[in-house]
C-alpha cells in the first residue's frame, strides 16, 4: 500500500469517525442483544444473563484508543453517581492481550467490571467497527441506544438516556 493510499484511508476514517460522533445516540427499537461471553479479570466467564434486571452500559474500548481513555473517567463518575441503583457499567476490551489491559489498569483504577475479548469475537458479533462504541441495554437485555465515539457519561444527553432506562424499572424498596 502506498503512502497516498494509506493517508487517503486515514482521512476517510477520520471523516467517518467525526460524522459518527456528531450523529449522537442511535435509538434502537428494543433490539435483542447478540450473545456476549467473555472473561473478567478474575477469570470468571460472564454473559449478559449475569446482568439481567439491570440497565447495562456496555462499552467496547481498547487501551490504544485515546477517545476511549478520555471517556473512562466519566464512566467511573457515572458509576459513583448511580451507586445503589440497578445500573452496571461493563467495559469490554477489544482484541488486546491480558498484559496490555493490565498495563493500562496499572495507570488508571476503574471500579466497574472489565471483560476481555482477546480474539475480538464479541466485537465482531456486536458489529463494532470503531472504538469506543457503547450500547445501552434495558433491564431485559435489549439494545435501546448505541453511541459510536466518546462522550461524558455523567452529564447531558448520555446521563439522560441512562436515567430514562432506569425510570422504566419498577420502583425499588428503600435499602
Descriptions of predicted regions:
Residues 103-111, 117-163:
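Thiol/disulfide oxidoreductase modules built on the thioredoxin-like
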Residues 60-77:
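Conserved redox-active cysteine motifs that mediate thiol-disulfide chemistry
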Residues 169-175:
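Non-globular targeting/processing and membrane-anchoring segments
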Residues 8-18:
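Bacterial N-terminal signal peptides
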Residues 86-98, 112-119:
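Thiol-based oxidoreductase modules, predominantly thioredoxin-like and allied folds used
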Residues 57-59, 89-91, 135-136:
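Hydrophobic beta-strand core positions in alpha/beta domains
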Residues 22-48:
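N-terminal "domain-start" segment that seeds a small globular fold
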Residues 54-56, 60-64, 130:
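Short pre-active-site segment immediately N-terminal to redox-active cysteine/selenocysteine motifs
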